[in-house]
Amino acid sequence: MNSDPTLGDEIAALAAQLEAGEYRLITKIGEFDAQGGYAREGALSCAHWLSYRVGLGLGPAREKVRVARLLPK
């Protein structure tokens, strides 16, 4: 079976982009949580807002907020 020799490199590059995007997302979630942005939109918590606005399940949303709160300020 012949495989594209650059396919592995493309996968690695895409994975790096996803991780960088996830870091930016978590950072922004931390800022939004600290500023209480969710409350201005009527949500009970940042996790509830993420669940409603972004479509995450409440469990994964809580995990993102938990991780965001652990990041250095």
Give each language-model segment a name:
Residues 1-73:
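Peripheral, non-cofactor segments flanking catalytic/redox cores
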